[in-house]
Amino acid sequence: MGRYIGPLTKVSRRLGVFVGGDIESFQKRNFPPGQHGRTQGRKKLSDYGVRLQEKQKLRFLYGGIREGQFKRYFERASKAAGNTGTVLLQLLERRLDNVVYRLGFAKTRLQARQLVKHGHFLVNGKKVDIPSYELDKGDIIEVREKSKKLEVFKENLESRDPRSVPRWLEIDKDNFRGKVVEIPEEIELEIPVNVQYIIEYYSM
């Protein structure tokens, strides 16, 4: 299965949580597509369906990662030392597009992915245009010199509360630069996700 490129608002409505798209539309119509109003309620899911939904929530939260790629992240996490769920989240958080989003260079992960693919960022002084590029402790991420004049970066940085940047990252707004201070141990997601259900999904 490839990456989903359809309207994320519909995905959010189907999952019942906001993973992207138009937030106002989602809030007004927070019920599954094809359903007329909230009165019908959501269908009760099977055990498999519940676990599939949690996996989809996490996959789409990180910008609609391809199914095959997401499964490979899980396989790496399951073979690594430590808690599988924690390692899975660490791998997702260390993606370049996610770090660009977390630092405030982009308003959404999807926007971050596009900005990375268009070659606007350097990692440790070298251009990297691969959204899934995996960052490590000590890595420096910065906007390329010729891209610093673009309004999108100024607007995004100015609108983002610096307190929203997680502790494992640090941002230097004046120089359009960020740093991975450490590998995150405690990861706060924007929506509730039962990671244990995702582990169980891949074990079914």
Curated annotation (Swiss-Prot):
**Entry's HAMAP family?**
Ribosomal_uS4_B
Q: Which NCBIfam families match?
A: PRK05327.1, rpsD_bact
Would the keyword rRNA-binding turn up in this protein's UniProt record?
A: yes
Report which superkingdom the organism of origin falls in.
Answer: Bacteria
GO molecular function terms listed in the Swiss-Prot or TrEMBL record: rRNA binding; structural constituent of ribosome
GO CC terms: small ribosomal subunit
Residue stretches making up the S4 RNA-binding domain: 94-157
Keyword match Repressor: no
Q: Name one Pfam family in it.
A: Ribosomal_S4
The record ties this protein, via PROSITE patterns, to: RIBOSOMAL_S4 (PS00632), S4 (PS50889)
Which gene produces this protein?
rpsD
Q: Which organism is it from?
A: Sulfurihydrogenibium sp. (strain YO3AOP1)
List UniProt keywords, sorted A-Z.
Ribonucleoprotein, Ribosomal protein, RNA-binding, rRNA-binding
**The name this protein goes by in its record:** Small ribosomal subunit protein uS4
* GO biological process entries: ribosomal small subunit biogenesis; translation
